[in-house]
Regions:
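A charged, well-structured terminal subsegment
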Residues: 94-110
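Short acidic-hydrophobic, aromatic-tinged amphipathic segments that line or gate anion-handling sites
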Residues: 87-93
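Flexible, charged surface loops at secondary-structure boundaries
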Residues: 4-6, 31-35, 63-65
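STAS-typified acidic loop motif
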Residues: 1-28, 44
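Short aromatic-glycine-(Arg/Gly/Cys) micro-motifs in beta-strand/loop hairpins
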Residues: 60-82
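Alpha-helical scaffolding segments of alpha/beta enzyme cores, especially the outer helices
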Residues: 54-58
């Protein structure tokens, strides 16, 4: 797992191509990242299934309850299959854009 801090956001990149192992590692180390917006980059995992993505839902919900953003990057995923409460985008740029928009919404009290 590769970790990169950019301002108020931490980017966690899966380097092994296994979303389940990546989720286990992120969950194990969650206390290190809970105060930051998170981008989880799953672009190395070419075989992401709906069930594989849904495994991230509890972590996403937990992070959002703490008033922080969690965005998943999955370029080869059918976004229409994902539940509305999950934010899944194809690129890092879009992930940063989503976080900026959510930060503005929180600042405005939405």
């Amino acid at each position: 797992m590769k970790v990169e801090d950019k301002g108020h956001t931490t980017i966690l990149k899966d380097t092994r191509g296994s979303s389940s192992a990546f989720l286990a590692k992120v969950t194990e180390q969650y206390n290190n990242y809970k105060g930051k917006n998170l981008i989880l980059d799953l672009s190395q995992d070419g075989e992401l299934s709906l069930n594989g993505m849904l495994a991230f839902l509890p972590l996403s919900n937990k992070h959002r309850k703490a008033k922080k953003s969690l965005v998943l990057i999955a370029p080869n995923f059918d976004y229409d299959d994902a539940p509305e409460e999950m934010v899944i985008v194809p690129t890092l740029l879009e992930a940063h854009d989503i976080i900026e928009m959510e930060e503005i919404e929180r600042d405005l009290g939405f």
